[in-house]
Amino acid sequence: MKFLYGVILIALFLTVMTATLSEARCGPCFTTDPQTQAKCSECCGRKGGVCKGPQCICGIQY
């Protein structure tokens, strides 16, 4: 049973790390920079990047 809990914990950890790294590939957003939105969009490959707090979040285009 402990082995199963360990496997689940590792899978959860890897899932969180993958999600974090996929969103963290862009540089930080600074509200004092007038070009922040353009830089965020460029970093996301022109797919609708948005600054949320200190990080740039890339939108998903379907």
UniProtKB/Swiss-Prot annotation:
Disulfide topology: C26-C43, C29-C51, C40-C56, C44-C58
Primary localisation category: secreted
A Gene Ontology biological process term: venom-mediated perturbation of biological process
Key words of the record: Chloride channel impairing toxin, Disulfide bond, Ion channel impairing toxin, Knottin, Secreted, Signal, Toxin, Voltage-gated chloride channel impairing toxin
Function: Toxin with unknown function in healthy organisms. On glioma cells, interacts with chloride channels (probably ClC-3/CLCN3) and MMP2 at the surface of glioma cells. This complex is then internalized via caveolae, thus inhibiting the chloride channels necessary for cell shrinkage and tumor propagation. Induces flaccid paralysis in H.virescens larvae. Is not toxic to S.falculata larvae or mice.
Written domain comment of the UniProt record: The presence of a 'disulfide through disulfide knot' structurally defines this protein as a knottin.
Protein name (database record): Lepidopteran-selective toxin
